[in-house]
Amino acid sequence: MPLAVTLEGCRVRLEPLSLSHVAALVRAATQARDTFAFTMVPADHAAMTRYVQAALADQSTGWALPFAIYDLRSQAVVGSTRFLDLDYWSWPPAWPPGRTTPRPDAIPTVAEIGSTWLAPAVQRTGCNTESKLLMLGHAFDTWGVLRVTLKTDARNARSRRAIERIGGRFEGIRRAHARAVDGSVRDTAYYSIVAAEWPDARAALAARMSALPPLGRPATGWPGGTRAGLSTWTCRAAPRDRSRRSPGGCPTAPRLASGACPKSGSAPRPTSAETRSR
């Protein structure tokens, strides 16, 4: 089963999803909900609690690994994302006879990244791009997966453009595939990145991150955030990396153009004690 792990870049930290995130997720989900037309995003505390509980139940079976997205600029949880549809092509079989969960040492062979949503205030700020870079790096460079799937409602032009920007290759439309958020039957657009494509996709994502404007103060009035200490911003290193900070604030000396964080241009490293999924 995959390990629960924290992945940190220069703009976001992906934290293992837990019930302690519910209140912050509700705050993020109550902004301009018209942006969630194609995504199931609970709007109140009770529904968000059920949402997180369902994600954790999927994690307990080895099928998913969910995260809360923490924005390092606003110092607030701003959304959620996850690995899902994890499959294990191992021998001996990942699922021992009579068990419905994979062996503790089973590593995913293929994965999907999905169930992603972000508060409107941080959309198109690099949070999604860096989240994908961190997750793709973990999937390909840590797990060694062969393929990562990304999919969305075929009508969701914005999501499809975002997937294409991060290197997803269009595979086709699966017709009448699932029930949409509005209750209609949706067609689903499928994309993927395979292992052979990952080096080019990683370089393109790192270039996109380096082209983003420098981070400054968060927008006034961000729910749950704070402006304290954010007149200048440096990326946060893991405790074990603090002795290796470069002058610009990120661990390790090489920096990308425009002050981008080198952590986001390479395989992400776990930043907190890892615990096995339960």
Regions found by a protein language model. Name each.
Residues 118, 150-160, 260:
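Conserved beta-strand-loop-alpha-helix junction that forms the acyl-donor binding cleft
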Residues 156-172, 265, 275-277:
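Conserved active-site alpha-helix within GNAT-family acetyltransferase domains
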Residues 70, 80-82, 254-278:
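Vicinal oxygen chelate
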Residues 124-138, 161:
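Conserved acetyl-CoA-binding loop-helix of GNAT-fold acetyltransferases
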Residues 141-151:
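Conserved GNAT acetyl-CoA-binding A-motif
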Residues 235-252:
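Compositionally biased, low-complexity flexible segments
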